[in-house]
Amino acid sequence: MIRGSEGKLLAVVALGATLSGCGGDWQNWFETEKVTPAVLTQPDSASQLTDYISRATSAGKRVRMTGNGHAMSDIAITNEVLFTPDKLNQPLNLDRSRLKNPSDPGLVRVESGIKIADLNTYLDAHGRALFNMGGYDGQTLAGIMSTATHGSGLGFGPVTDSVASLQMVVDGGKMVQIEPSNGITNPATFNGRLEENSGIAVQLIQDDDAFNAARVGIGSLGVIYSVTLNTDQKFWLREVRHEIKWSELKKPGGYLDRVIHGLPVYGDGQPSPEHWELQYTPYADANGDHTFLITDRYHSYTPLPEQPSSERGQPGTDFASGLVALLGQPLAGILDTFPELAKPVLETTLNAEIDDNYTNVSYKVFNIGVVNDTPALAVETAFTLDQVSAAIERCFTISDAAMSQGIPQTGPIAIRFVKQSSALIAMQNGHNTAFMEIIELRAGKNAKKLLGMHQTAYRQEFNARPHWGLDLNSLTSEAQARALYPDTWDRWKTQYRRFNVSGTFDGKVTDRLGISVRPR
């Protein structure tokens, strides 16, 4: 007898069937997107993925796979068949007999739904590490891949640039293994079968455009089953945080100028941090200047002291961050009522993070900690490096204009630097990139309005690219997307149509962009 969600799935995707009310609600972490799909289920194997997707294609149903809900946009959702990744979260065997270089120690294979926190724990136990990551580790690997999520440091691309190979279930329930043209797999020793289940055929595709489309596919080419990653050996980070004024930071030959031009940040003979980022308040001080916090992170392959998070920043910072996470809603209400208080709040927040030395294993330094639990909204925008100073100063004017309307900026603004990527619609495609992330307390009555003001200005004035996940669904036509990716959009779309022949992986995002194979 077929029971539970599997039975519901078979019912809803049976050819010609109609069924409602058997799924349940799904909502993202930001509470900006909520759907009641006809089916909401957790595939637990490649066999289930291929079977469910085959049936969905036959019935003309749409399928999407969520991550952990940390995309603010509609990228992950559908009203039809929605998968969640909770049961596809394990490390997998890598059959090294299939590889061109079987002895490569850096290759690791995992299921796509593994959370970054669990991936880090697994890698650490095996003496390995991610080269770089963002400040939050609760996301799934497939989620951060598909949206080109990143850390900071111009020596490192987005996390998806560490992908060596991926296995994906595409239209009709077919499993494909996609790699670059010079991929890691030896076609002569590849047996065309899935490692975990020899009953599942796998087509090896070694093609640059297919690979560069699939690894940032915004969930629209198929459902990723497994990922093989290139990893680094385990390393530690020393973090230093210090304040500087904008007038000093931006001057010709100053720190920002040196970073943009690939020069040693602190001058010849001084060590340069591998990871460099900024936080700032958009509000001027009494002298008309702005406070910035620089975060330097230096690599060490020699073990460093592994300090507890309570020793990071000024005394009490960890406790204060936890308090903000707990009291986000009342704090937002206070700042809505007394918006001018946002100015000292932001200055105090930056001051609290100053630290002349914090060390730990890499992934514990990359993770910004309890502040991730703060109920917030966020948008992120990608600029070319030569735009970053002008973009920051435009941010000042937008924030001042909003404050004049009683709309405060309720969190520090971050600037991160990321190496260019060959993924076709990664925000980093074609050039090194500076990202601006703007965070607002979720309960602020005008939070979305302020974020929208920023997004609109940056796209219209800079032709800047919105992050695929941290976005208020700001792109509403294919023409807008093509203008942002003039050299690569049509190449990506060709692969989208190649693997999504029947429209199985259409979704709200493809409807919004006007590219769905079968529009609803």
Language model: regions and residue ranges:
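Glycine-rich N-terminal segment of FAD-binding domains in flavoprotein oxidoreductases
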Residues: 32-113, 117-135, 148-153
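Activity-critical C-terminal alpha-helical subdomain
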Residues: 364-371, 446-450, 456-520
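FAD-binding subdomain of flavoenzyme oxidoreductases
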Residues: 144-259
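C-terminal substrate-recognition/cap domain of FAD-linked oxidoreductases
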Residues: 277-449
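Bacterial N-terminal signal peptides
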Residues: 11-18
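Flexible, glycine/charged-enriched surface loops at secondary-structure junctions
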Residues: 266-279, 403-414, 462-472
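Bacterial N-terminal signal peptides that target proteins for export
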Residues: 1-9
